[in-house]
């Protein structure tokens, strides 16, 4: 078999890659993870488990829900419905077809269910199986994710945003002294499950502990402890230790000495060792904890205390009479003076009391005695009364309710994460599979709460990322699915009980509509399922990586405080501290950091490099916020020597709580992978981010997402090196699916022959159909352009076509333009921007915007609507763009008001006169009346029609236009099929030729002589079909030919079948909405040139509006005659502190001057003044080691590379690791420019030099999606509000300018009485007045009369609603 690599003469595509001069110093040991894998992993891997065999599926996602809901049994346990397995059918339409036909991209879910029916013997109660039926049941269409991590719902692309919510588990807090006037801290605990009832425990101001369930009325915590089955003895013994006071005759009590309970104080009595009788300290002397520990260490175990010391202590067991065993006092009671006398009288020698730390109080004992419930039943009934007020109480109902609240897996679920968090916080060791509360949990929550009150341990930080987790798409949809299946379960049980179970099949029991409705509702209306921001590829990626704290189960805007929104130390490397919206959502909507990923428990992890004995390894470890707290972590820019050892005596490290410490190198556990891991994708695209103020960086990253894709794309000269990753992961550009060779290329498609051979050795073909002028969600233009040429060798995942806003595989949101910072006649006051006419003339910032218009022909009560060219009362001129069917031609230039699709609607008939009746009788039936309901171009829209789509209902005859579009599409399918076949045939027949040449013929077509040896010339005379007729002597060759023929036929058949399926789908008609006969969609593309009023911005938060377009000859220019493109105001810099833009401008200036220098060298080389070595030397000086791969190539390729950089040298200055000021100066010197980056500039109007040197350079600017064309409008006559009769406002209502209260004051202050009257009456809501004014204008008169404004009438009506009658009476005088 021949290797297909033999005929690769062309250069690999990788030769075309752009090389950037990189200023970064830190070697990257970890690649940026795929930027949209969060979405894909969560949905496809964890929820659907799509391409995994049934037996290998893990119990998670869809599998776990189905396992938990099934089996479903009926009330009498006769029928039992079990879940066996699930699988997905293939989708009916692909992604493109779904978005064109306004359908959802979804696959049918087929679940195999087994229905078992039992026979129960009424006497013995034994059960026997009566029958088993297994069946595959359709459970509705489940939306699938596209390869870019989005969903197509009703034809629009949507994204499900991940949600940040509080992790399940137990949390301890205090109220920060806000509740009680004294400022006393009241501690509380809250158990938050994944689903189920919340449990709160809290101290009140009197130090009694209460609990509440679901924020209902509070009860004593001991009621909860009794409800879980603890008696008074058990409660006291669990929470308190006991100590025994032994009677020492005539001396007092001997008791154990506990040094931990000693605080510094003066003794009121002597400190006496009970064992020896020695006095250690006299009364009045001071004892300290240190001294107490010393005595304890020297053997002081028991001390003597006075008789009355027992008063005020609490009994740790019942006090009994030694003689009669009668209970004198109950456990927990306080010993009083009377009780002490009884103890002395009865000569009780040992008294057990509770050990209570003097600094804290007997909280649980006090709560126990405040609680009136003395046993479990009373406690359960008390809880029942609070949760079900008004219902009759019985113990069974109370017990069942309490059990269901916290211990039933159906209704309560902590989730695995909740259990892990609970175990770690309470120091328990309960299995992770136990996802309900246990008795140990409740006992220990109370214990920890009391310890916190006593000052042991610290409260939890809610905003710590160890306490907040991410719910991604899969999990959000899983929760919806569970809701749907639980609802469905109820209907299944009802159906089981209703009918005769013996004759029922599983599909009769299941109603999939319930499930489908829930899923549909989530995708269409949920706050987290959002219309994808598709302005440019960056906005797509950012939207998919967004984390929202809002949404169901999350926070609400109004209630979120400052703490939740603030940046937390644990955000480092996980959530971007920069990128968040300005406005009310600030801090609630965040973006994931570039390198972050989400672990299986939903916590965000960040990568670190392991450090062993002060040596930095290349091992990368991902740590969550909880794990990170255990280690000392150094910065990525710590100095490392050649052997990988950390340099310096001390290293600055982060530790728990966001603090920094200096430690020795061997103590460091990890260091950051790269400084870029702190920020998000958008922020990592900003060069010199480290020199910008954070507020401006925030604006910069937000505005990059609003950049409109331009006609001509241009990657930034000054980038950060991340541009390629963003373009690749966004899905905007086209990636090669396999290694291969490019066979055909045109602007619409690329055909690549795959090099990975199948088992049969025949090649396969990839055909990439490029998107041409498609409308995005935000009406920007999606257009793909090939980057490869015929013969190029491409590798898997190479970029073979650029998409919107990409240039040579790098993201390109704007253009590089020559900028000067100087004031120019006040035209750049307040951030205005002055631009040169060249920018408009050469379409530098021109963008294409596509709008979609749709018309539906419906079946009405009076008859069907019709799409036609025959429209009543319309001139031929108005129909000039329509074809014979009444649909506009592609390529037509349209203006506002033009007809796009002609449509007529039947009109209800008015009663006819007798004369008309007579005429109808004579001349036959007149055609019924129709009215014009055509689709017109709305105001403010003009452009070129780029596409028309016609959809006809199944069974309705197609019109000429639909047939023409269909024919065009079929031709496209046929071309794809023929090209693929041609490549396969070329391969097959060249292989056959290699096999046959030199063989001896024993049978064959007429041209072949038996016994002849086959030659290449002889085979050229045969047709392809005759190749198969040849038989040769060699049996092995014949076998191989037989195999080739079989595979070739199979391949051909598969291609024909695929073609037939596509054609059939195309011709079968469409599923249109109810009542629609035909739908026509027209797409109009508009070119938007840059004009005054458009908003532009840089990447550093420097934004402004264009104020004026100046002729080139008036713009300032350089000494070599180059005219500046844009003039910006230097005052926009100092106060805003975004100095990054100046460094970018300087480096951009170096970039174009280095390019000029390279061009000069190439020119000299061509004129034979210098050799290639000088060029190589300069390139090495400029690029460093980066350029070695280019310099090893032939001379002509080096010159070709130099030509590529003739417009500007591309730099990469990574975030926080980029070029310093000195590097910029070095580049300017290398380019032969002044290191200040300033030049002499000449005024275009006067021809004189400006007084001072001016900063000039290349800067990357973006045109934002705030175009003046979409904002400006004017009103002549338009709609009025119904009640107030005032003109409406806003562009969509064709409204006017509001003349508000303050505007009235201005006219009053000016004394313009008549203007004011006109504004408040005829120009506003005086209905009669405006009609009269209109009449007088028509007659050519200039006077008007104003009446009563409608708002006055409204006010009178409001008075009347308050029963006050107001009349306006005009007296005759």
From Swiss-Prot:
Reaction(s) catalysed (UniProt annotation): RNA(n) + a ribonucleoside 5'-triphosphate = RNA(n+1) + diphosphate
Catalytic activity, EC: 2.7.7.6
Principal EC category: transferase
One cellular component (GO) term of this entry: DNA-directed RNA polymerase complex
Entry-linked SUPFAM superfamilies: beta and beta-prime subunits of DNA dependent RNA-polymerase
A GO biological-process term: DNA-templated transcription
Gene3D superfamilies: 2.40.50.100, 2.40.50.150, 3.90.1100.10, DNA-directed RNA polymerase, beta subunit, external 1 domain, DNA-directed RNA polymerase, subunit 2, domain 6, RNA polymerase alpha subunit dimerisation domain, RNA polymerase Rpb2, domain 2
MF term (GO), any: ribonucleoside binding
The keyword Cytoplasm is assigned to this record: no
Span of the signal peptide: none
Keywords associated with the record: DNA-directed RNA polymerase, Nucleotidyltransferase, Transcription, Transferase
NCBIfam families recorded: PRK00405.1, rpoB
Subunit annotation: The RNAP catalytic core consists of 2 alpha, 1 beta, 1 beta' and 1 omega subunit. When a sigma factor is associated with the core the holoenzyme is formed, which can initiate transcription.
HAMAP family: RNApol_bact_RpoB
Entry's family note: Belongs to the RNA polymerase beta chain family.
General function of this protein: DNA-dependent RNA polymerase catalyzes the transcription of DNA into RNA using the four ribonucleoside triphosphates as substrates.
Protein name (database record): DNA-directed RNA polymerase subunit beta
Taxonomic classification: Bacteria, Pseudomonadati, Pseudomonadota, Alphaproteobacteria, Rickettsiales
Gene: rpoB
């Amino acid at each position: 078999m021949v290797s297909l690599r033999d005929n690769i003469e062309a250069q690999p595509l990788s030769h075309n890659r752009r090389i950037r001069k990189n200023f970064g110093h830190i070697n990257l040991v970890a690649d940026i993870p795929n930027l949209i894998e969060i979405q894909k992993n969560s949905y496809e891997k964890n929820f659907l488990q799509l391409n995994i065999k049934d037996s290998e599926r893990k119990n998670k996602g869809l599998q776990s829900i189905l396992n938990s809901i099934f089996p479903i049994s009926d009330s009498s346990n006769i029928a039992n419905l079990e879940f066996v397995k699930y699988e997905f059918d293939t989708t009916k339409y692909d992604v493109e077809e779904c978005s064109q036909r306004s359908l959802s991209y979804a696959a049918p879910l087929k679940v195999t269910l087994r229905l078992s029916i039992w026979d129960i013997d009424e006497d013995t109660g034994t059960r026997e199986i009566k029958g088993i039926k297994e069946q595959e049941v359709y459970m509705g269409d489940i939306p699938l994710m596209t390869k870019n991590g989005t969903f197509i719902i009703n034809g629009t692309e949507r994204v499900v945003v991940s949600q940040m919510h509080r992790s399940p588990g137990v949390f301890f807090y205090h109220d920060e002294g806000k509740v009680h006037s004294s400022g006393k801290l009241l501690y509380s605990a809250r158990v938050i499950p994944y689903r189920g009832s919340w449990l709160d425990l809290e101290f009140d101001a009197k130090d009694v502990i209460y609990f509440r369930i679901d924020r209902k009325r509070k009860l004593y915590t001991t009621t909860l402890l009794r409800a879980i089955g603890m008696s008074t003895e058990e409660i006291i013994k669990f929470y308190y230790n006991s100590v025994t006071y032994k009677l020492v005759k005539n001396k007092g009590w001997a008791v154990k000495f506990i040094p931990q309970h000693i605080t510094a104080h003066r003794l009121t009595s002597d400190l006496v060792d009970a064992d020896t009788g020695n006095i250690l300290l006299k009364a009045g002397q001071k004892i300290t904890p240190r001294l107490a520990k010393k005595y304890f260490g020297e053997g002081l175990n028991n001390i003597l205390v006075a008789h009355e010391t027992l008063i005020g202590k609490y009994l740790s067991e019942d006090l009994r009479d030694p003689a009669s065993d009668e209970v004198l006092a109950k456990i927990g009671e306080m010993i009083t003076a009377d009780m002490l006398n009884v103890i002395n009288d009865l000569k009780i020698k040992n008294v057990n009391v509770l050990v209570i730390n003097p600094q804290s109080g007997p909280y649980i004992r006090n709560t126990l005695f405040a609680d009136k419930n003395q046993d479990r039943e009373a406690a359960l009934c008390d809880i029942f009364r609070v949760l079900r007020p008004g219902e009759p109480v019985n113990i069974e109902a109370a017990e069942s309710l309490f059990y269901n609240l916290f211990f039933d897996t159906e209704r309560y679920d902590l989730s695995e994460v909740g259990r892990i968090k609970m175990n770690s916080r309470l120091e328990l060791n309960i299995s992770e599979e136990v996802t309900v509360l246990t008795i140990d949990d409740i006992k220990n929550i109370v214990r920890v709460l009391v310890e916190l009150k006593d000052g042991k341990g610290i409260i939890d930080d809610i905003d710590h990322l160890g306490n907040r987790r991410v719910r991604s798409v899969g999990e959000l949809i899983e929760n919806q699915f569970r809701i749907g299946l639980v609802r469905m379960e109820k209907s299944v049980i009802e159906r089981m009980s209703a009918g005769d179970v013996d004759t029922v099949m599983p599909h009769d029991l299941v109603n999939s509509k319930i499930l489908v409705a829930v899923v549909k509702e989530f995708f269409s209306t949920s706050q987290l399922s959002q219309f994808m921001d598709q302005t440019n590829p960056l906005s797509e990626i950012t939207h998919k990586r967004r984390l929202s704290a809002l949404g169901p189960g999350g926070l609400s805007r109004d209630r979120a405080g400052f703490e939740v929104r603030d940046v937390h130390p644990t955000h480092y490397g996980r959530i971007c501290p920069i990128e968040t919206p300005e406005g009310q959502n600030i801090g609630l909507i965040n973006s994931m950091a570039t390198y972050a990923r989400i672990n299986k428990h939903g916590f965000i992890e960040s990568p670190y490099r392991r450090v062993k004995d002060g040596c930095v390894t290349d091992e990368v470890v991902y740590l969550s916020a909880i794990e990170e707290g255990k280690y000392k972590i150094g910065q990525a820019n710590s100095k490392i020597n050649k052997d990988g050892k950390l340099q310096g005596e001390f290293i600055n490290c982060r530790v728990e709580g966001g603090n920094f410490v200096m430690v020795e190198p061997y103590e460091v556990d990890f260091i950051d992978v790269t400084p870029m891991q702190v920020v998000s994708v958008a922020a990592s695209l900003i060069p010199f981010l480290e020199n910008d103020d954070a507020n401006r960086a925030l604006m910069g990253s937000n505005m990059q997402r609003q950049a409109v894709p331009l006609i001509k794309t241009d990657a930034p000269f000054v980038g950060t090196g991340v541009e390629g990753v963003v373009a690749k992961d966004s899905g905007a550009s086209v990636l090669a699916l396999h290694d291969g060779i490019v066979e055909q290329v045109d602007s619409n498609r690329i055909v690549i022959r795959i090099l990975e051979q199948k088992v049969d050795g025949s090649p396969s073909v990839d055909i990439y159909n490029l998107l041409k002028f498609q409308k995005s969600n935000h009406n920007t233009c999606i257009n793909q352009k090939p980057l490869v040429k015929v013969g190029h060798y491409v590798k898997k995942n190479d970029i073979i076509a650029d998409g919107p806003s990409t240039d040579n595989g790098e993201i390109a949101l704007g253009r590089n333009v020559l900028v000067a910072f100087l004031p120019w006649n006040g035209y750049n006051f307040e951030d205005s921007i002055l631009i040169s006419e060249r920018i408009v003339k050469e379409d530098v910032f021109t963008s294409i915007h596509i709008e979609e218009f749709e018309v539906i022909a419906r079946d009405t009560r009076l008859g069907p609507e019709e799409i036609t060219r025959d429209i009543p009362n319309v001139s031929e001129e108005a129909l000039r763009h329509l074809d014979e069917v009444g649909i506009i031609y592609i390529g037509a230039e349209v203006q506002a008001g033009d007809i796009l699709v002609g449509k007529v609607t039947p009109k209800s008939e008015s009663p006819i006169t007798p004369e008309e009746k007579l005429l109808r009788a004579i001349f036959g039936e007149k055609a019924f009346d129709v009215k014009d309901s055509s689709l017109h171009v709305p105001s403010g829209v003009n452009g070129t029609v780029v596409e028309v789509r016609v959809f006809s209902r199944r069974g309705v005859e197609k019109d000429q236009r639909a047939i023409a579009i269909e024919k065009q599409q079929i031709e496209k399918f046929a071309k794809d099929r023929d090209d693929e076949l041609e490549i396969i045939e070329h391969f097959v027949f060249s292989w056959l030729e290699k096999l046959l040449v030199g063989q001896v013929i024993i049978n064959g077509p007429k041209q072949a002589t038996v016994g002849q040896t086959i030659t290449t010339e002889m085979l050229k005379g045969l047709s392809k079909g005759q190749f198969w007729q040849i038989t040769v002597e060699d049996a092995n060759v014949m076998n191989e030919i037989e195999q080739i023929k079989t595979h070739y036929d199979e391949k051909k058949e598969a291609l024909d079948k695929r073609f037939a399926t596509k054609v059939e789908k195309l011709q079968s008609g469409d599923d249109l909405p109810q009542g629609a006969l035909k739908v026509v969609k027209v797409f109009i593309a508009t070119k938007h040139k840059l004009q005054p009023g458009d908003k532009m911005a840089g990447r550093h938060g420097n934004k402004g509006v264009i104020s004026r377009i100046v002729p080139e000859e008036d713009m300032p220019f350089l000494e070599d005659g180059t005219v500046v493109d844009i003039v910006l105001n230097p005052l926009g810099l100092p106060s805003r502190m975004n100095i990054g833009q100046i460094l970018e401008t300087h480096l951009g200036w170096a970039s174009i001057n280095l390019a000029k220098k390279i061009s000069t060298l190439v020119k000299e080389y061509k004129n034979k003044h210098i050799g290639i070595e000088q060029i190589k030397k300069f390139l090495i000086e400029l690029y460093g080691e980066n350029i070695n791969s280019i310099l090893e190539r032939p001379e002509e390729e080096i010159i070709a590379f130099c030509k590529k950089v003739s417009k500007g040298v591309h730099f990469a200055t990574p975030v926080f690791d980029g070029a310093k000021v000195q590097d910029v100066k070095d580049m300017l010197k290398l380019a032969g420019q002044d290191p200040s980056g300033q030049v002499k500039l000449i005024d275009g109007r006067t021809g004189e030099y400006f007084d001072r040197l001016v900063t000039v350079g290349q800067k990357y600017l973006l045109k934002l999606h705030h175009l003046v064309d979409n904002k400006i409008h004017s009103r002549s006559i338009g709609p009025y509000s119904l009640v107030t009769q005032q003109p409406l406002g806003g562009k969509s209502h064709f409204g006017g300018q509001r003349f508000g209260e303050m505007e009235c004051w201005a006219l009053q202050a000016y004394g313009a009485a008549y203007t004011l009257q006109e504004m408040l009456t005829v120009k506003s809501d005086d209905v009669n007045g405006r009609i009269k004014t209109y009449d007088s204008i028509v007659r050519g008169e200039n006077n008007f009369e104003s009446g009563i404004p409608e708002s006055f009438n409204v006010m009178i009506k409001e008075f009347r609603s308050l029963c006050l009658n107001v009349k306006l009476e005009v007296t005759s005088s």
